[in-house]
């Protein structure tokens, strides 16, 4: 890409029902777009687990520090889960996208909708569907082996899938490599949008002189 016509980063939001392939696809995207895409790092008040690194897995803070971040508008969104706070730090996201690096969010539809509502101009959202509900049933059964859990997960999946209409793109994950390829195409084209071209006016003014 011409150094005089760079693009800002995007907030790439990926969702799918459990067993839809979201996690695998996200890992592959990070591996293949490593110079242009980073995984979102959340802030949390929970204690670090063995092997977790501050600033890589999470930003670990006290509850007092977390509340202060919220009160000073430094969190894009946050929630309390099982007694611990989790949130998306505004500075981490904006520092990346303003320098041309995109941020990947592998989240459920509720988190996706929150980001769409507050950061619409930066968000590109993709919902991943399993090849079929029968295939999803097979995957879930292979994971748990318990029919009652599978039945519950399938019900949850149908509810989640019903929210796909608000996403920018919907992909049926017949093949992981093909799904990754499709999302990489989306990624490239979205970063080439006029509104994401940094210093475009200056570039054009010099171009037509």
From Swiss-Prot:
Q: What does this protein do?
A: Essential for recycling GMP and indirectly, cGMP.
Species whose genome carries this gene = Ehrlichia canis (strain Jake)
**EC number(s) in its UniProt entry?**
2.7.4.8
Q: Which HAMAP family match?
A: Guanylate_kinase
Gene Ontology cellular-component annotations: cytosol
Question: Where is it localised?
Answer: Cytoplasm
> What is the catalytic activity of this protein?
GMP + ATP = GDP + ADP
Main localization of the protein described in the UniProt heading: cytoplasm
| Upper lineage | Bacteria, Pseudomonadati, Pseudomonadota, Alphaproteobacteria, Rickettsiales
Keywords for the protein's UniProt record, in alphabetical order: ATP-binding, Cytoplasm, Kinase, Nucleotide-binding, Transferase
Which sites bind ATP? 16-23
Which enzyme type, at the first EC level? Answer: transferase
Q: What is this protein called?
A: Guanylate kinase
CDD domains given for it?
Answer: GMPK
Keyword Calcium in record:
no
NCBIfam families found in the cross-reference section:
guanyl_kin
Which residue range or ranges hold the Guanylate kinase-like domain? Answer: 9-188
Stored InterPro entries: GK/Ca_channel_bsu, Guanylate_kin-like_dom, Guanylate_kinase, Guanylate_kinase_CS, P-loop_NTPase
By sequence similarity, the record places it as follows: Belongs to the guanylate kinase family.
The reply on keyword Transferase is yes
Name the PANTHER family for this protein.
Answer: GUANYLATE KINASE, GUANYLATE KINASE-RELATED
């Amino acid at each position: 890409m011409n150094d005089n016509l760079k693009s800002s980063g995007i907030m790439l939001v990926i969702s799918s029902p459990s067993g839809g392939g979201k996690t695998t696809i996200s890992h592959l995207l990070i591996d293949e777009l490593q110079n242009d895409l980073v995984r979102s790092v959340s802030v949390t008040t929970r204690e670090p687990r063995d092997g977790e690194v501050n600033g890589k897995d999470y930003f670990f803070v006290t509850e007092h520090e977390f509340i202060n971040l919220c009160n000073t508008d430094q969190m894009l969104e946050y929630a309390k889960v099982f007694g611990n706070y989790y949130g998306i730090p505004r500075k981490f996201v904006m520092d990346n996208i303003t320098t041309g690096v995109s941020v990947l969010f592998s989240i459920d539809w509720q988190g996706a909708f929150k980001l769409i509502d507050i950061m619409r101009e930066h968000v590109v959202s993709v919902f991943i569907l399993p090849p079929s509900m029968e295939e999803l049933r097979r995957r879930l059964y292979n994971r748990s082996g318990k029919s009652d859990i599978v039945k519950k997960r399938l019900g949850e999946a149908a509810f989640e899938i019903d929210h796909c209409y608000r996403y920018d793109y919907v992909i049926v994950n017949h093949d992981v490599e093909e799904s990754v390829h499709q999302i990489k195409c989306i990624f490239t084209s979205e970063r080439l949008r006029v509104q994401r071209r940094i210093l475009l006016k200056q570039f054009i003014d010099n171009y037509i002189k």
